[in-house]
């Protein structure tokens, strides 16, 4: 029995599912989750001292790699003064200034929270408070955290009220969220024609990445902006995952900044916290000043703007200049090409969706454009692929519905390990369970 096996058995006794977030439990791929004891640069080391090349990056935040010396120094300096003040701090101000400056005029102010869930929840409350309307429009497969308003799935018909996607979410709450198939601008138009005067906001990921990466249809986000504004609603662009990762200005920098439109509100997370609990809502001064204490829409948090998290985020953003993004994009190009070549060589049907340095590998022979098509991938083949990759020293997300993340810490030696590991994983996906241990069935 491995140390991870022993720790997981203990964890199951005191933590639901043995984890603090469901995907970590390996339920979709089988087997025992590996417990991590340290990470440095592009590598993860588990409690059994096995080393992996990291292609998860803590689900996105570790864009400059783990334990980068400049980030570590900034955090140590911050915690030496205290782990929390519960009061304004200079580092909080400097991070706010950096986020606003990087967005190039798209936002004037930010409000920090501790998680992406809180950030989107705050943005939704703000939109409802400003418009005095109840409805939110989201898209099936887009994840905006686990607040009650967003744990819904679409019913049949364009204007179907949301149904709770989790026990504990009252139907009355879910009923104020309408979930539509992603990419169907015709259904958005139909909904607004019928109920546009009730909609507070459309909430969308700039690039969906929580059902796997989905490439937005040409002009889709701009049309969402235009439709919302034509009916007096707001557009909330959730960039918790994509913000400051896809480009210096996130997904918006690849789309809206070039096309001449701007969402009303943004949400950020992951990268801006440098791996620590931090997220934010951003927008124009006119909208953001509806938040207390300037305005009537309430939001608060004891640890919001935590100095250690702000220090980590500020140091991380400072590392990500234009050259760093160019290097990151080039690395992602190479890794995605390796995955494509390995699966092609093994004869495994697959599709790779990619935007900038973010991509997903779907084991299916059909285009993946929304949650319905993503759900048709071969999850059993992915389980074989995942475990063979893990054995070969690759740290992948334990689900076929996730993005692959690269960091600037990946080097040529890492890429050789990745290439070899992906070929082994592809062969396992093609051959079935015969080459795997029984525990992984």
From Swiss-Prot:
It catalyses: (S)-4-amino-5-oxopentanoate = 5-aminolevulinate. It is an enzyme of class 5 (isomerase). It comes from Propionibacterium freudenreichii subsp. freudenreichii. It is found in: Cytoplasm. Belongs to the class-III pyridoxal-phosphate-dependent aminotransferase family. HemL subfamily. GO terms for biological process: protoporphyrinogen IX biosynthetic process. GO terms for cellular component: cytoplasm. Keywords: Cytoplasm, Isomerase, Porphyrin biosynthesis, Pyridoxal phosphate. InterPro entries: 4pyrrol_synth_GluAld_NH2Trfase, Aminotrans_3, Aminotrans_3_PPA_site, PyrdxlP-dep_Trfase, PyrdxlP-dep_Trfase_major, PyrdxlP-dep_Trfase_small. GO terms for molecular function: glutamate-1-semialdehyde 2,1-aminomutase activity; pyridoxal phosphate binding; transaminase activity. The modification N6-(pyridoxal phosphate)lysine is found at residue 270. Its EC number is 5.4.3.8. This is Glutamate-1-semialdehyde 2,1-aminomutase. Pathway: Porphyrin-containing compound metabolism; protoporphyrin-IX biosynthesis; 5-aminolevulinate from L-glutamyl-tRNA(Glu): step 2/2. CDD domains: OAT_like (cd00610). Pfam families: Aminotran_3 (PF00202). PROSITE patterns: AA_TRANSFER_CLASS_3. Its cofactor is pyridoxal 5'-phosphate. Homodimer.
């Amino acid at each position: 029995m491995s140390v991870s096996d022993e720790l997981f058995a203990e964890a199951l006794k005191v933590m639901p599912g043995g984890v603090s977030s469901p995907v970590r439990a390996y339920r979709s791929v089988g087997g025992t989750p590996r417990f991590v004891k340290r990470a440095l640069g592009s590598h993860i080391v588990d409690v059994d001292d096995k080393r992996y090349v990291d292609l998860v990056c803590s689900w996105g935040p570790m864009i400059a790699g783990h334990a980068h010396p400049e980030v570590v120094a900034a955090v140590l300096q911050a915690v030496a003064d205290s782990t929390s003040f519960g009061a304004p701090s200079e580092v909080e101000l400097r991070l706010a200034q950096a986020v606003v400056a990087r967005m190039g005029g798209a936002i004037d102010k930010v409000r920090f929270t501790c998680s992406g869930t809180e950030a989107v929840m705050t943005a939704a409350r703000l939109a409802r408070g400003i418009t005095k309307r109840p409805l939110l429009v989201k898209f099936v497969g887009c994840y905006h955290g686990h607040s009650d308003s967003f744990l819904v799935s679409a019913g049949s018909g364009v204007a179907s009220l949301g149904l709770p996607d989790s026990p504990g979410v009252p139907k009355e709450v879910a009923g104020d969220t309408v979930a539509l198939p992603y990419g169907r601008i015709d259904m958005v138009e139909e909904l607004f024609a019928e109920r546009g005067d009730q909609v507070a906001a459309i909430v969308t990921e700039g690039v969906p990445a929580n059902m796997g990466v989905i490439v937005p249809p040409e002009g889709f986000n701009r049309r969402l902006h235009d439709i919302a504004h034509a009916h007096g609603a707001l557009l909330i662009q959730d960039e918790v995952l994509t913000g400051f990762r896809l480009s210096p200005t996130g997904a918006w920098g690849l789309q809206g900044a070039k096309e001449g439109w701007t969402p009303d509100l943004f949400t950020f997370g992951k990268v801006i916290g440098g791996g620590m609990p931090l997220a934010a809502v951003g927008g124009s001064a006119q909208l953001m000043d509806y938040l207390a204490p300037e305005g009537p829409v309430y939001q608060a948090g004891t640890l919001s703007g935590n100095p250690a998290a702000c220090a980590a985020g500020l140091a991380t953003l400072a590392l990500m200049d234009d050259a760093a993004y160019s290097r990151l994009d080039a690395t992602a190009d190479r890794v995605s090409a390796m995955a494509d070549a390995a699966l092609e060589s093994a004869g495994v049907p697959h599709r790779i969706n990619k935007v900038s340095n973010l991509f997903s590998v779907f084991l299916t022979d059909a285009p993946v454009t929304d949650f319905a098509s993503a759900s048709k991938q071969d999850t059993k083949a992915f389980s074989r692929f995942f475990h063979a990759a893990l054995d070969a020293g690759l740290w992948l997300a334990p689900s076929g519905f996730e993005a692959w993340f690269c960091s600037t810490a990946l080097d040529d030696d890492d890429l050789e390990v990745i290439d070899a590991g992906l070929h082994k994983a592809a062969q396992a996906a093609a051959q079935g369970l015969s080459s795997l241990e029984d525990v992984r069935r």
